[in-house]
């Protein structure tokens, strides 16, 4: 097991305990049956900007966007739960997992861990419905996610990782507006 995967459970525990301290509770957002608590949005943004300001200089392709407007525009409340869950899972399993070694070199591991841990908290709380009546909604969200993933896979892996990480602000802004944070 790699060092990065060994540290994630410890960091998750720290985040969980930290969120239990009075006065440090995170914000709550909900949409339909989706609800997330324990997210400290200002700290999430601060962590993102710390990492982005370090790695964004590597993004040489400014004409390509992975989180295109058609991925995030006109998303229904029910659909948002599925889409946010899929995007966060992709970021954790693909982008953050493969970006960890670069982050260690830049010495912004603490901010990176804050960002990853908050994504874990949000994703673990988003529980899209498995009800068959929701199938058309989940399929629509899946199609939106596939647009994002296809754009990611069309790029060289390293370029795609930098690009995806640089677009975390687009994802956070969408979630913030969508859930009225």
Swiss-Prot record:
Keyword Glycoprotein: yes
Knockout consequences: IL24-deficient mice are more sensitive to CCL4-induced liver injury than WT counterparts.
Pfam family, one: IL10
PTM entry text: Glycosylated. Ubiquitination at Lys-97 promotes proteasomal degradation.
Record-linked SUPFAM superfamilies: 4-helical cytokines (SSF47266)
Any single GO CC term annotated in Swiss-Prot or TrEMBL for this entry: extracellular region
Disulfide-bonded cysteines: 34-81
GO biological process: apoptotic process; negative regulation of cell population proliferation; positive regulation of apoptotic process
Superkingdom to which the source organism belongs: Eukaryota
Distribution of this protein across tissues and organs: Selectively expressed by Th2 cells. Expressed in the liver.
Entry keywords, A to Z: Apoptosis, Cytokine, Disulfide bond, Glycoprotein, Isopeptide bond, Secreted, Signal, Ubl conjugation
Function: Multifunctional cytokine mainly produced by T-cells that plays a regulatory role in immune response, tissue homeostasis, host defense, and oncogenesis. Possesses antiviral functions and induces the type I interferon response during influenza infection. Signals through two receptor complexes IL20RA/IL20RB or IL20RB/IL22RA1. In turn, stimulates the JAK1-STAT3 and MAPK pathways and promotes the secretion of pro-inflammatory mediators including IL8 and MMP1. Intracellularly, maintains endoplasmic reticulum homeostasis by restricting the eIF2alpha-CHOP pathway-mediated stress signal.
Name of the featured protein: Interleukin-24
Organism: Mus musculus
Lineage: Eukaryota, Metazoa, Chordata, Craniata, Vertebrata
Gene name as annotated: Il24
């Amino acid at each position: 097991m790699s060092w990065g995967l060994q540290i994630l459970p410890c960091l998750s525990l720290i985040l969980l305990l930290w969120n239990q301290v009075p006065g440090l509770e995170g914000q709550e957002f909900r949409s339909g049956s989706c609800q997330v608590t324990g997210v400290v949005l200002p700290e999430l943004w601060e962590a993102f900007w710390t990492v982005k300001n370090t790695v964004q200089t590597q993004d040489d392709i400014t004409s390509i966007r992975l989180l295109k407007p058609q991925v995030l525009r006109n998303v229904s409340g029910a659909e948002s739960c599925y889409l946010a869950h899929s995007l966060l899972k992709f970021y954790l399993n693909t982008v953050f997992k493969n970006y960890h070694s670069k982050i260690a070199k830049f010495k912004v591991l603490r901010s990176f861990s804050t960002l990853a841990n908050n994504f874990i908290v949000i994703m673990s709380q988003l529980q899209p419905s498995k009800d068959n009546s929701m199938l058309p909604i989940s399929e629509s969200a899946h199609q939106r996610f596939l647009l994002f993933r296809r754009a990611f896979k069309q790029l060289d892996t390293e370029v795609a990782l930098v690009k995806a990480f640089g677009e975390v602000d687009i994802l956070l802004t969408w979630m913030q507006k969508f859930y009225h944070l």
